[in-house]
Amino acid sequence: MEIPVGAQIFDLVFHPSHSTVYTALLTGHVKAFAYDAATHQDSFSVRPSKRSCRALTINEDGSRLYAAGKGKSIHTIDTVTGEIVETRAAAHDDPINRLKHLTPWLFATGDDNGVIKLWDPRQQESVRTHRQHFDYITDFLWLPDKHHLLATSGDGTLSVMDVRAKKTAPFAQSEDQEDELLAATTIKGGAKVVVGTQLGILSIFNRSSGYGDCVDRVPGHPSSIDALCALPPAFLESTTSFPGMENTVLTGSADGLVRAVQVLPTRLIGVVADHGDLPVERIAVGGGAGVLAPTLDEDKNEDKDGRVGKGKGKAKASSEDEEADEAAETGAGRWWVGSAGHDEVLRLTDLEAFFRNPSSGEGEGEASEDGDRDTEGSGDIDEEEAAEKDNEDEKEQPEEDSDGDDSDAPTARKRKRKPEKDPLVVRRKKGKNEVDVQGAFFDGL
């Protein structure tokens, strides 16, 4: 399913219990869409700032959505009506690049200068500030068993903060990995952390042995790995699993492909979604209720209890075609992979259907048997050209400020990609920590 949004998507989140997805756009808008197995509809569109919205996160019960971006403020949005209920102006000195809800009483923000702040939703001011990074924050990973917040950065390191501690020094910080760390998730039941890098390598960190350096490196992606997402435990429990499924991650790469990859032992399961030649910036997995949520016009007289998918929305869902009704009854399509990039389209892929019949791709971007390659070839997009493209996109928006482009966004630095699908410029020798991948790891992709 494809949902056109009209602008580049920087982030997306799913409602925790109902079929609604929220997107953060270059134009500064936050757009919400309700969906079922057959169709979708707009829920609301709100513009908290004229500057780009880069980051979203949603609280546990799905009643509040937090949005932030180049405007440096944090906006709290009602997830049903789209009403902005609270704004924390000038929350950072630099544009905010990442948001993460941690607990009912805590969420985190990270900016372009590497500053991380922890916030209590009940207070206007931040409760703690961390400054161990000197480049932009690319991703957050919450480790609830230890109350640890892991952050990755463009400075080549990851850090771990104990949110219960009062000190600002991190619990741990890795050595310089000599590569931009762009995304993080967990495998092995949370025992290992997988990190995506600019060079297209998956770096594996073992939590039990510390975060000083990675213990394994898995090459194979022909371009940078900009997004990672693990399969939710609820999905693993609700579907027929195969061996190693708990060690499977979804990867979003600058070559435009969303892949399902099993890690340790490593093998490509298939291509989940294809965004053409445009980079994939964000991936999320959502398991909704299987019915359309009410839009603002339909539900404006209903109680604003923070829930969606109730009330008049059910009446509309009941009028859908027989295929959608049957899918909702059987639960097919309940789990969706949302992927977004530079193509101004949100793609929703049926996750259960994919694992019933995994794709092996269409022969794009073949890799060598060890999957490795040099990413510093002459085909990289010039950063100034990427910035000019952002400027052109922004000028097309009628209400934007003259400085409202996102040309200095960290996403511009992550757009290094090759226009040609063949990544084999130079074959490097395998490093001491790299994992041997049996056969052609990404053969045919």
Model-derived regions, located:
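Short loop/turn segments that connect beta-strands within beta-propeller blades
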Residues: 35-38, 79-82, 121-124, 163-166, ...
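A short beta-strand motif characteristic of beta-propeller blades
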Residues: 1-3, 39-46, 83-89, 125-130, ...
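Terminal intrinsically disordered, low-complexity extensions flanking WD-repeat/beta-propeller proteins
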Residues: 216, 222-226, 231-248, 256-257, ...
